[in-house]
Structures are given as C-alpha cells and as structure tokens.
A protein has these predicted regions:
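Short linear motifs embedded in intrinsically disordered, proline/glycine-rich low-complexity segments
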Residues: 1-269
Length: 269
C-alpha cells in the first residue's frame, strides 16, 4: 500500500525537500496520518484570513470519547454561541457515586496548534495540542440562571481564557506554567485565588499526564487548571513547581479532596 500525491504547483515547496520512509503495522492508521499531514501542509493560506479554528468531525468525536473514558460520561455541554477564533464548548461531567464532584472539560482548544519551538518540543517531549479541565464541588450551581452570576461562572471564564491564551499571545502552555489575572484581582470575591497553575489531572497531579492520541496523528494533552493564591505563586517562583505541589498536596493526602476543599465556599476563611 502506498499514497500518491500529485502537486501541480511545485513552487510552493522550498528547496530543501527531504525524503522519509515510514513503516507501520497499522497501514490504515499510517495512511490517515499521512493524509492529515499532507492536507495541513498543502492547504492554501492567506495571512489576512480570519477563520474559525475547529476540529475535524473525526478528531472531535475521538476527543469526546477520550473525555468520557478518562473523566466520565456526560450529556450536558455548555455550547459557545459566538466564537471569533477557537470554538470552545465545555463538557459538564456530573458527580457520580465514586466521585462527588463536577468535572469541566473544554472541547475545541486542541484544534489550535500551539507555537512551541522545535528544540523545546523535542527536548521535553511536548505536545502542541491541549484541552483544559477543572473540578468543582458537587453543590456548585450550574443551571442557566446561576451561571449568569460571575460567582458561579468564573471557572468557565478561566477555562476559556486559559485555552485561548496561546492563540492570543502566540505562545504555549504546559504543566507547571502559571497564569494570573490582569490586575491581580481574585477570580471571584468569594475566593483568595488570583493565579492558576497547570498540573496533571488528579489523582496523579505531579507525575502522570493524561493524553488522547487521535487517529489523525495529533496528541491532545489534558491540563488541569488549579487556582492558587498570590502567596502560593510567590512560593512557586522561589521554590519551584514540585515544592508547591508537595505543599498543596501533602504526602498521603487524597488529591481530589484537597482540590475540592479549596473551592468549597463554606471552607473559605
């Protein structure tokens, strides 16, 4: 089996064309990968065009299946009504018997390819694609009327702003990166958090990444956004990510209990 590609405009190629040989036990998957990469490479582009960045139907379906498999089944999705760049929906994964909390997960952020320098990408084995999650207490108000109140909506705003930040700033995000509010103000008056750190999804917040390998060849990472205080940010800057996570998640603790307790309103001093 082989793939034949006819290129009519050879001027579109640079002089340093390389030849690569690929072997695979899964010919169908290899073909899908090659077709995806050729389509991306040969697609005409206009720097003045502003187009909506979307998953292919197949990629989106596979991402949704990964979310269901890794984080839980869901029926409700907070759909974005208008999108100027990335179309970002948020899956609402309800509490279950074995997990008394909500999981919010973006659907759409991974359609955007983050701008990571090749040397950094290869040295640290980074993916250029990511989705973002947050965990909320099971009593968080998520009905339409309640989400009109910023006190309930701010986690969604944080998810969406974080997901769009690499596009807005032509940069990239990965585990250990921190983000702050523009004026240093808390995300909500009810909480002391005005910064966030990206960590791995619980329960392996410091040691194991969660990823979704698509048949198109993309690898989508799932980053957990953990709100932190200004003091915790300063501690992290002085001592490093590992030290901060050891402080927030003491040895032997239940990581999810810690995450949820930090967002319980009655537990805020």
């Amino acid at each position: 089996d082989f793939i034949s590609v006819e290129v009519k405009d050879k001027n579109a190629f640079k002089d340093d064309i390389a030849l690569a040989y690929l072997w695979s036990d899964d010919v169908q998957k290899l073909r899908d990968h090659m077709l995806y990469f050729w389509k991306e490479a040969l697609a005409p582009s206009n720097p003045d065009d502003i187009r909506l960045i979307l998953y292919s139907e197949q990629d989106e379906n596979e991402v949704i299946e990964c979310i269901k498999e890794d984080f839980g089944e869901f029926q409700n999705v907070l759909h974005e009504v208008a999108s100027a760049d990335i179309h970002l929906d948020v899956a609402l994964i309800p509490p279950q018997e074995d997990r008394d909390y909500y999981t919010l997960c973006t659907i759409g952020a991974g359609a955007y390819r983050m701008d990571i320098e090749r040397e950094i990408r290869t040295q640290y084995h980074l993916s250029e694609y990511a989705e973002y999650i947050m965990y909320l207490p099971s009593d968080w108000k998520l009905d339409n009327e309640s989400l009109m109140d910023e006190a309930n909506y701010w986690p969604f705003r944080l998810l969406k702003n974080t997901a769009r930040l690499p596009l807005w700033t032509e940069s990239w995000l990965t585990m250990g990166h921190t983000l702050g509010t523009e004026e240093g103000e808390p995300y909500s008056e009810e909480y002391p958090y005005n910064n966030s750190i990206l960590i791995y999804p619980a329960p392996f917040v410091a040691t194991r990444e969660d990823k979704c390998n698509l048949s198109s060849g993309k690898t989508i990472l799932f980053h957990h956004i953990l709100p932190i205080t200004q003091e915790e940010l300063e501690f992290k800057n002085e001592n490093g990510t590992a030290a901060l996570l050891e402080r927030i998640f003491p040895k032997g603790c239940d990581e999810m209990d810690v995450i949820i307790s930090r967002l319980k309103r009655e537990g805020i001093s």
